[in-house]
């Protein structure tokens, strides 16, 4: 049996709420990087990627993921109709794959893992940001 996609309807103008979250979290990424705090940068990058994906899906579909594992966020982003959305949904999936490591596991991320999640989140944010402007 296929999993039911867990989403909620959100009015498109509310994209600004999710965009502001993403903007502030990306600022936190830069601050953490400047202090060589790789874990903090990675955690903020994951949260920024989720927020910017929500902003895109709210803007394009009027929907936001509410699933606990963020699978719906990846699926929604992939089908939102924006140019490059499928590729960027894959980026989001890769970012989310590192979330548990950064936040919960009993080992620290490698330098490569920490840097990779930040770079992927930055690419997702840079792709999404221009078409989310008011």
Predicted regions and their residues:
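Terminal alpha-helical segments
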Residues: 1-134
